[in-house]
Amino acid sequence: MPGKMGKVVQVIGPVIDIKFDSDSLPDLYNAIVIKAGDYELVAEVEQHVGDDIVRTIAMSATEGLKRGMDAVDTGAPISVPVGEEVLGRLFNVLGKPIDKCGDIEVKQEYPIHRPAPSFKDQSVEPEMFETGIKVVDLLAPYQRGGKIGLFGGAGVGKTVLIQELINNIAKQHGGLSVFTGVGERSREGNDLYHEMRESGVIDKTALVFGQMNEPPGARMRVALTGLTMAEYFRDKGQDVLLFIDNIFRYTQAGSEVSALLGRTPSAVGYQPTLATEMGALQERITSTVNGSITSVQAVYVPADDLTDPAPATTFAHLDATTVLSRGIAELGIYPAVDPLESTSRILDPRIVGEEHYKVAADVKHVLEKYKQLQDIIAILGVDELGDEDKAVVARARRIQRFLSQPFTVGEQFTGLKGKYVPVKETVRGFKEILEGKYDELPESAFLFAGTIDDVIEKAKKLG
């Protein structure tokens, strides 16, 4: 049976008003298909305006759209394919393949608007998730089934860190990943896709993109498309990694849509529904008794201001934060993770163990002391410090460099072979540095090394 028929009566950019009979108005969030010859566009109902008009947001560019075109209510929200068939493929917001590898055989579809799991279905067992990245595993460990935020300004390495995590998860854990590109550069998405094909991790990953050049409707909904695909695997008992790059663009697209729909903006020009929209997405990203979704979300921080409403609203939902610092990047230390700003809820002796907790606390203490001494060093120089403070500075500089690490995904740029460091090795390395075992080794030996054994090898070569 064909759906309810309507006609396009107004087009203002991505906002389309469609007139239906007053007794057959489509429900909110229903998908509407506008067709004329070869032209086809999908829009989502956002508002009912008056008795017989619905206001919709287009999911693709509206060039070629005219008043008077026929529109059909599909009777359901946008639905996307789920299941094993989506692995290794690249999709748009509507779940259509965009990798030119042919259609997929759709066995099952889920609507992108779904309720979050109920309390009784949720799992609350805290467990550490090993990433193989030293600075993360030691100082701000990730929780299996947790939500992690990657905070940083433009160009400090958020996307590279995400790519390394995808690589490590696929190769070391054999886990499935869903990568959602929300409002980021198409070039980066293209590079990621080809790198994943070359490295062979693509078979364990589904990619969903709604990039910078797409209308706000697509950028606002593409995160839900990726999440829906991840939910299917979780409900089938698997551990999934959901990457969202960038969650700020989700908020930004929501802000554009809100303004287009005529809502009064709230603080800093953001949408009044900012917290509600963020909650609707984040509450669905959770672990159940069946399986888990661990999500890593890159968070662009406008003008490096962490108090901006977009990053501040995101903070409330996170279990761990990895803060990338421009100051550390300027020192040439990568990943440029700020060891003192990054936090984790599970850095707790009952979860990570007594030894790990103590080593992490001592590393932070030494780095904190070094930070306090930097003003004195800048004015008077290192020679004016007491012997104890000199030892702290020397050790802190070695720790700072040992927190760097060569990445597999950066091999073609750095010429250094990427290293995956198990958490036991990470703890042992930092413990021995704190004990003063390597005070005589040159600082440069600690930079871009994997384990502490690599440092010793490097020091021998440096002679």
Curated annotation (Swiss-Prot):
Q: Where in the cell is it found?
A: Cell membrane
Record-annotated residues binding ATP?
A: G152, G153, A154, G155, V156, G157, K158, T159
Q: Which reaction does this chain catalyze?
A: ATP + H2O + 4 H(+)(in) = ADP + phosphate + 5 H(+)(out)
Q: What EC number(s) does the entry state?
A: 7.1.2.2
MF terms from GO for this chain are:
ATP binding; ATP hydrolysis activity; proton-transporting ATP synthase activity, rotational mechanism
Q: Which GO terms describe its cellular component?
A: plasma membrane; proton-transporting ATP synthase complex
Coiled-coil portions: none
Query: What job does the chain carry out?
Result: Produces ATP from ADP in the presence of a proton gradient across the membrane. The catalytic sites are hosted primarily by the beta subunits.
Q: What is the designated name of this protein?
A: ATP synthase subunit beta
By sequence similarity, the record places it as follows: Belongs to the ATPase alpha/beta chains family.
What are the protein's UniProt keywords? ATP synthesis, ATP-binding, Cell membrane, CF(1), Hydrogen ion transport, Ion transport, Membrane, Nucleotide-binding, Translocase, Transport
User: What is the protein's quaternary organization?
Assistant: F-type ATPases have 2 components, CF(1) - the catalytic core - and CF(0) - the membrane proton channel. CF(1) has five subunits: alpha(3), beta(3), gamma(1), delta(1), epsilon(1). CF(0) has three main subunits: a(1), b(2) and c(9-12). The alpha and beta chains form an alternating ring which encloses part of the gamma chain. CF(1) is attached to CF(0) by a central stalk formed by the gamma and epsilon chains, while a peripheral stalk is formed by the delta and b chains.
Origin superkingdom = Bacteria
Top-level taxonomy: Bacteria, Bacillati, Bacillota, Clostridia, Eubacteriales
What membrane topology does the UniProt entry give? Peripheral membrane protein
Location (main, coarse): membrane
Question: Sorted alphabetically, which SMART domains does this protein's record hold?
Answer: AAA
Top class in the EC scheme = translocase
